[in-house]
């Protein structure tokens, strides 16, 4: 398996016995049955373009972006690749997608092989998933405020700061560009939940000093 970057999925596949080649020249992808595209979101189009001349008919290609379905892999599919998507959500749950039945069977097998539970999702469900994951990530702001209150009262709590603030699992760091954040905001159908989300985004920007990248200011 050729992987564009090291990731949770490539590590898990290596754990169950797959030979993984990470961060190798793109030309080497042609020698692998499975190509895993797990680059940060802004770099995915460039990786796909670089891979296009090297992809062969029947080769499996999988990306790990939450915000994109398999359509982003169209340039590789037209060259005969079996295209799939899988993203880790929480615990053993992975959301998946594929362009055809072979892809569905393959991605289900890969995720099941690492002990995961594959959950097929449609593209229109992805903004809701992104909103849920972003809200989980923003929980950090609440935990940090709570920790700062406790630190003034409980001596020695600093040694437990990491566990208190982050918990057992850190949600994926999703892109924070204006379009992505507006997609996430629009996914909150419940006005109260949207207001909570906006408040947490505002709290994060106050703490980090980062201006909001779009026209809608939280």
Residue ranges and their predicted role:
Residues 19-21, 83, 118:
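Hydrophobic anchor at the start of a short beta-strand
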Residues 26-91:
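Rossmann-like NAD(P)(H) cofactor-binding subdomain of soluble oxidoreductases
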Residues 1-5, 38-41, 64-66, 97-101, ...:
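Structural motif
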Residues 1-30, 150:
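NAD(P)+-binding Rossmann beta1-loop-alpha1 motif at the extreme N-terminus of oxidoreductases
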Residues 8-12, 16, 76-79, 91-172:
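Internal alpha-helical scaffold of NAD(P)-dependent oxidoreductase catalytic cores
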Residues 20, 35-37, 107:
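Hydrophobic beta-strand residues in large extracellular and virion-surface proteins
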Residues 152-218:
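Interdomain hinge/lid region at the active-site interface
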Residues 23-25, 86, 121-123:
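Conserved beta-strand termini and adjacent loop/short-helix elements that scaffold enzyme active sites
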